[in-house]
């Protein structure tokens, strides 16, 4: 006699096992940890397991997470500014002044936005440095990896980040913004034959005016953020597709694959294995329980700490560091000296000293220092994964011996950029003369 089926009531989880956020602080099994990812859309960015080594704070310094948190802060702080700012040469400055001095918490929101923009440039650059110095752009032991293309995308994302900050620089429409953008766009005009056309396309005319402001405004609030968001999503998908951080590759390469115990009575008819036999399963070290942890909750927890820590740090900094607002933009009064944004000051410094005379032929310093040299640097940086001949054992290793020479050259270039940036920021005075940081500048009126 067949007994009737009786529905059994599911037993509730013990108190404290699952949190209201949809994941467990202490999962009872790997399956429960994996189910948290499968059942929550927000956690789909995380793999089921991650390498313990790649979780270390001192390996990646979580610079990618910090960069993403700063991008989120830029969007969050930019939304109220979007409703308050007026992109008009007649009203832009006054609307920013109202945000700064009239709107409740307006000064703090603007400071958060500005600090986040500057810190994002630094964080993305440091993230790129970390990837280079660890050789994380090289493929490891896994099949189907394309880390080199993710590196190329990272270089493009750095350039977009710089341009995103540069387009926002003009929006306050004060003297600092107007002349910084003037200096920056003048470098583009130094390209032979096409330079003036490139500059006109960039600023919408021959002078910086209403068309320039509208172009920079649309680029800053729509096109560049959307493009950067799409690239970030693909970048993270590619990281997961390539097996996570390159540090995990070291564990897979240094440890020999282990053979699973053979159970002669096991059968897998779907695979065509004959009865009485069993396949030999080889597991890489990255898959071993002793070298991995569950992404939920370990990776999620550390991601939350890095994100919230970044947001808190920026919020506190914005209390003490106000955003500057100088006099309204005036094309007839040139500040002395007129400087590019700080992240382009190293280029302005090179431009000053790179005019080359070859007989009757003269190479413009703006073209040499502002186009040729940075173009070569970006080109080499982009192509380096294919030029680097180091072994896979150097992948994911800080300052690997086989990469000592290229790391040294890379660091020398970075140090040179930092020195030039410092000189341009702290040591250039009126008429672009050199002064010690503690030395007073002479009283020289602005150029009219």
Regions of interest found by a model, annotated:
Residues 67-79, 155-186, 305-332, 412-426:
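Hydrophobic alpha-helical membrane-insertion segments
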Residues 53, 81-112, 169-216, 322-364, ...:
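Membrane-interface interhelical loops and short amphipathic "cap" helices
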Residues 30-34, 48-59, 63, 312-448:
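Aromatic-capped, Gly/Pro-kinked transmembrane alpha-helices
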Residues 214-215, 219-223, 228-334:
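Long, contiguous internal "core" modules enriched in hydrophobic/ aromatic residues
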Residues 52-68, 133-158, 175, 179-183, ...:
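Membrane-interfacial loop-to-helix junctions in multi-pass inner-membrane proteins
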Residues 23, 27, 42-62, 106, ...:
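Cytosolic juxtamembrane amphipathic/interface segments immediately preceding
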Residues 5-39, 81-88, 112-137, 151-152, ...:
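Transmembrane-helix bundle segments that line or gate the permeation/cavity pathway
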